[in-house]
Amino acid sequence: MYALLLMLILADGAALPGTWKGRISDLKCGAMVDTACNRRCIEEGQQAVLVEDETGEIRPINNTDFVKKYAGAHVEVQGSSKDGQINVRVVKPLDK
């Protein structure tokens, strides 16, 4: 029953809730996280991304303005994911 429900949700393209840990970067710099550069690029209009700790995957963040003050920081984000992009609802800075 749960498997069927999950298949229907995924087939519909619904956003799935989740929690991810990583560093906030920007689309131009990607996995090359540099706080000053990331801040500058995001201020200039680049989309924010999360570089995941475990996989190194670069996940675009839909609501860049919500996370821009954390550029270059190691964070845990909570939100939802759809089509590989994260819509962040909560940001928790992590120890360096």
Regions found by a protein language model. Give the residues of each.
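Classic N-terminal secretory signal peptides
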Residues: M1-G13
